[in-house]
Amino acid sequence: MEIQIERLTTTEAAVAAGVSVPQINRIIDEKILPEDLYSTSPTRTFRTDAALLIAFYFETADSLTTNARLEAIRNAKMRCSSWSEWKDCTVGDQYLTIRFSDLWKEVDQRLRRLSEARAMVVEDPEILSGTPVIRGTRIPVHDVAAQVEAEVPIEEILEMYPRLSAAQVALASIYAAAVPQRGRPRRLSIPGATVVSMTKKRLRSSSQGA
């Protein structure tokens, strides 16, 4: 299935490329990519295929010079345009050949997972005043992702949310990374629980601050 070229926010681009948000911002601040791959107005957004070149730029930092990476990006951009073309895109000369196929598969998989995560979440004014929830439930997606971030074992998370599957929990984590919670974080609401055991990491933080 062809992935449609669309716009990604900085956080979505970070998820798709497998890099950090500061690295994503560097791409624009340092004008690393051709300008038609991103926009800065009204907000910073990227074309979907930019995620592949962002991943390439950072993943090859230890093996290629900055100039070599920039030249490869320019040459690849001239040869490949559609997402399917990027799969077999190859650039180089008699001294160096760069094939994007393996990296394309990784980015393509992340993009598909991101699409699945988006499709799993709904925002309905009639459900928790529009709080993003997992489709078919009233479970806030960011609450589930917070448990993953806190390193709560998946078995415990599934006990807290018996209506969810392990796959949905994984997608919740992806969604939260791509679409961070707006405003002040909500207090976690865990079904059927009045006391929540804290992770070792949280316990350590509490003891240090006592």
Predicted regions and their residues:
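Basic Lys/Arg-rich amphipathic helical interaction modules
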Residues: 1-5, 58-125, 129-135, 139, ...
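Polyanion-binding surface elements
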Residues: 2-23
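The alpha-helix within a helix-turn-helix
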Residues: 14, 158-159
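Helix-turn-helix-like N-terminal two-helix hairpins of bacterial/phage DNA-binding regulators
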Residues: 21, 31-36
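Pre-recognition alpha-helix immediately N-terminal to the DNA-recognition helix
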Residues: 23, 52-53, 140-143
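Residue-level detection of the helix-turn-helix DNA-binding "recognition helix"
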Residues: 25-30, 174
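Short helix-start
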Residues: 34-60
